């Protein structure tokens, strides 16, 4: 019986190791990447553990990449400081397949890619591109705080839609937004000849008071 239990434990442990293997499929741990930034400082993907990270393969010479960059910038600006169920904050680890440093830096500046940018300037001969099975760009991988791949190749609005699914909703912020809308509606009605001091105003006033009380309780 004891040997049987030990075998079960070993099987479970082996299954855990298998499920957490390093690879490029959803559910795998993304392989580490260590490449220099434009200043020559080496940056490791694993140093960003704890955050939600988009591993983004692109190049300044890639037309589709440049067209996609505004969507990526918008997602970064919107979600950079958010808290997620799968990590704290959102950042981007941009890997360029450029071979000319000047063009790479120019692309970063023009497209306002204000996040981690790295490259070995090896074009399609980059070992990192090979490691991640990248055959075309743009190409990306979304990883959680533990480096596990949760999504791949998120283009256009799909990137924001995917990030939104993982956002931790702040109840206080939600109530405050609702309160702001109700107060605006109340002020508009209060100055309206059509409504004056109607039942609608009293109803709104009660709703405002209830929300203010809810916010106060949440902040305790």
PLM region spans:
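Bacterial Sec-dependent N-terminal signal peptides
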Residues: 1-24
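Conserved helix-turn-beta segment immediately C-terminal to the redox Cys motif
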Residues: 67-94
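Alpha/beta-hydrolase fold active-site loops
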Residues: 52-53, 90, 138
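N-terminal "domain-start" segment that seeds a small globular fold
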Residues: 18-46, 168-169
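Short active-site neighborhood of thiol/selenol oxidoreductases, capturing the structured segment around
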Residues: 44-66, 72
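Short, internal strand/loop/helix patches
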Residues: 36, 93, 105-141, 145
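Thiol-/selenol-based redox modules, centered on thioredoxin-like
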Residues: 137, 142-220
